Curated annotation (Swiss-Prot):
Lineage of producing organism: Bacteria, Pseudomonadati, Pseudomonadota, Gammaproteobacteria, Moraxellales
Annotated gene: rimP
Predominant place of localization: cytoplasm
Example GO BP: ribosomal small subunit assembly
Cited InterPro entries: Ribosome_maturation_RimP, RimP_C, RimP_C_sf, RimP_N, RimP_N_sf
Described function: Required for maturation of 30S ribosomal subunits.
Organism (species): Acinetobacter baumannii (strain ATCC 17978 / DSM 105126 / CIP 53.77 / LMG 1025 / NCDC KC755 / 5377)
Protein name in the entry: Ribosome maturation factor RimP
Subcellular location(s) of the protein: Cytoplasm
Alphabetic keyword roster: Cytoplasm, Ribosome biogenesis
Tree of life domain: Bacteria
Keyword Transport: no
One protein family per Pfam: RimP_N
Cellular component GO terms held in the UniProt record: cytosol
Amino acid sequence: MKLSNKSQALYDMIAPAVEACGVDLWGIEFLPQGKRSLLRIYIDRPVDENAEPVINEDGEVEQGRGIGVEDCVRVTQQVGAMLDVHDPISGEYALEVSSPGWDRPFFQLEQLQGYIGQQVALRLIAAVENRRKFQAKLLAVDLENEEIQVEVEGKHVLDIDSNNIDKANLIYQD
């Protein structure tokens, strides 16, 4: 679950601009695609259902809200202007800003801690038990040893090194 050097450099550059917009930088994906690359930024705001209602700039009452379109627009403008000045991406690129959504991708091991007991989809770099793809229940996150523990098909438990995780997503369930 490590970012490439290019993605890490972009993350470090973008993070202050995103946080200045009052939201958290959940993660980024930088996808070189021939002549036109894609920079996808995921932003989030923890939903606090116990928070006091707040009146926003439009005079509307908000209670522990997540990310809205206006947040994405604000971050797009802020980050877009910064990228235009610093120009860290050679060639043309598209900038996308969105919430992580129901099937949120995970970019850091720490992010998984809030989802223990839930189903996740994993794509591994090296096969474990002759498989690279799993849908499993997340049982534990061990930050010290940098691994997760999952239950596969309700049958057996696997310990997976976080450096072997190519991609991890939440599986949304009602």
